[in-house]
Amino acid sequence: MRHGMANKKLNRTSEHRKALLKNMLNSLIKYEQITTTLPKAKFLKPQADKIITLGKKETLQTTKMLMSKLQDITSANKVKKTLSKRYEARNGGYTRIIKAGFRYGDNAPMAVIEFVDRDVEAKRVDRKKKDPAKDKTEEKKLATA
């Protein structure tokens, strides 16, 4: 019987589950939208909402709790400075799950989890801005070689 077992196990050990949660939380905070399987998205949603609620409280204790859960100072700073300000008028429901069909290889149900009222430009954090003139000079170098 499954009495009193509220948490999803996701067929992983407890340490693997904690690492998965931390990595997915950091990715969601950094990019504000990630694509994953539906069970993982359902596992992540309440935890992400709790992190935002924790970031809205302005105490040293909550900052330390954020650092212990995320273990990434840039993610913790983004929660405290950006996301908490964006959702200060909202009481919960900071994320949404959108079903995104099925994965090709194993037919697993996929989903997109994202922040409500997200910043569309946040997905472009790591992409380098390419200069078209520089690309043409590189093509010329390759053509002459």
UniProtKB/Swiss-Prot annotation:
Biological process GO terms, please? Answer: translation
Matching Pfam families: Ribosomal_L17 (PF01196)
Q: Which GO terms of the molecular function aspect are on file? A: structural constituent of ribosome
Q: Which SUPFAM superfamilies match?
A: Prokaryotic ribosomal protein L17
Matching InterPro entries:
Ribosomal_bL17, Ribosomal_bL17_CS, Ribosomal_bL17_sf
Gene3D superfamilies, sorted:
Ribosomal protein L17 (3.90.1030.10)
Keywords in alphabetical order, please. Answer: Ribonucleoprotein, Ribosomal protein
Query: Mind naming one GO cellular-component term on file for this protein?
Result: cytosolic large ribosomal subunit
PROSITE patterns xrefs: RIBOSOMAL_L17
Q: Which domain of life is it from?
A: Bacteria
> Per the record, which residues fall in region Disordered?
123-145
How does the annotation summarize its subunit structure? Part of the 50S ribosomal subunit. Contacts protein L32.
Q: Which family does it belong to?
A: Belongs to the bacterial ribosomal protein bL17 family.
Know the name of this protein? Answer: Large ribosomal subunit protein bL17
Q: Species name for this entry?
A: Pelagibacter ubique (strain HTCC1062)
Task: Give me the gene this protein comes from.
Answer: rplQ
